[in-house]
Amino acid sequence: MAIGAYFRPPSMTAAQYDDVIQRLAKAGAGAPKGRLYHCCFGTGDGMQVFDIFDSQENFDAFGEVLMPILASVSLDPGQPMIEPIHSIIVG
């Protein structure tokens, strides 16, 4: 079952987000297995992230790569809200 993961870190700038994205790409996780959609939004130090993964298992596997990267740049992701997806409407 697909899941949505919403991250609202206590503080994250666009520059910090961009740095994490570059580090994920270098680690071979720029396009992780099972991720269907990814978006980042917000302003200032209030950047937020929403992902949709095809399964909890693939999301958890991505987390095994993501969390050490976040720790290496001292970024606290906060506690994500993770819920099953009821529907996705495109367009």
Q: Where are the language model's segments positioned?
A:
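Short S/T/G/P-rich N-terminal loop/turn motif that feeds into the first structured element of a domain
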Residues: 1-50, 54-68, 75-91
